[in-house]
Each structure stands twice: as structure tokens, then as C-alpha cells.
Amino acid sequence: MQYLLVALSLFISLSSANLFDFLNNFNHGGGGRQQQQGARNPQEYENRILNSQCDQYLCPDTGLCVESPKFCPCPYPSSQIRCFLPDGRFVCISKPAGEGISDKYNDPKTNWKIDAKDDNIRDCGWVNRAWRGLV
């Protein structure tokens, strides 16, 4: 059950991100901004990753070289928070928004620790409750 909830959350997050990107490109004609993952030119992205001089761990979503997978940042840190799962992995979710709520989640050093203890606010506390089947 917990895997289903996490998978569903990831699917919704990715679908929303793809829809937003589509609408953004549709309204602005692509704008000339190269996506971080190089989706417009997969071969270029693949070459950049394969030819990386990283001697530690290369984050697949961002191409950053870090000490281990747990240090990989979210691809969109200004709008996402990284939530650690009980098994040591992590997922990136959209930051909670709303008056009096969103400011609490701006610091990446602490935003993953916040638990609003409210199932209507999707933060890392909610992710952990969902993982345990409590939501």
C-alpha cells in the first residue's frame, strides 16, 4: 500500500510538471531556455552525463556530482522539497503553498524536517505518514 501511495504521488508530481512545461513552451514558443535534463536533445544530455569527470556519484536528475545518492538535490529546488523515506531513498515533492505556510519551507536545510501534522498539507511529514499507510 505504501509503495502505491508514493508511486501515485510521484506520478501526479511528474504529470503536473510535464503539463506545466508543455503549457509554458506553448505560450512562449520554447523561449530558448535549455532544460536542465536536456530533454530537447537527449543525445547531448547522454553525452554530458557519460563524459562527466565525476569520481563519486552522479545524480541522474541534475547531473551534479555528489558524495552519495542521498546528497542529490531536487531538479527544481525553488519549488520542490526533498523528503527522505524510511528506507533511505528520497522523493522530491512540490513545496506546500498558501498564506502563512509556504515561508516555512524556503530553507532547504530544514524544510524536510517540517511536519504540519495536517493531511491537507503535503509536506515530508505527510510523505512519511503515507509511507506507513496512515493517510
Curated annotation (Swiss-Prot):
InterPro entries cross-referenced by the UniProt entry: LCL2
Any one of the GO BP annotations: ERAD pathway
Domain of life: Eukaryota
Key words of the record: Signal
tRNA-binding as UniProt keyword: no
Signal peptide residue numbers: 1-17
Protein function: Probable component of the endoplasmic reticulum-associated degradation (ERAD) pathway.
Family according to the record: Belongs to the LCL2 family.
Protein name per UniProt: Long chronological lifespan protein 2
Annotated source species: Candida tropicalis (strain ATCC MYA-3404 / T1) (Yeast)
Lineage: Eukaryota, Fungi, Dikarya, Ascomycota, Saccharomycotina
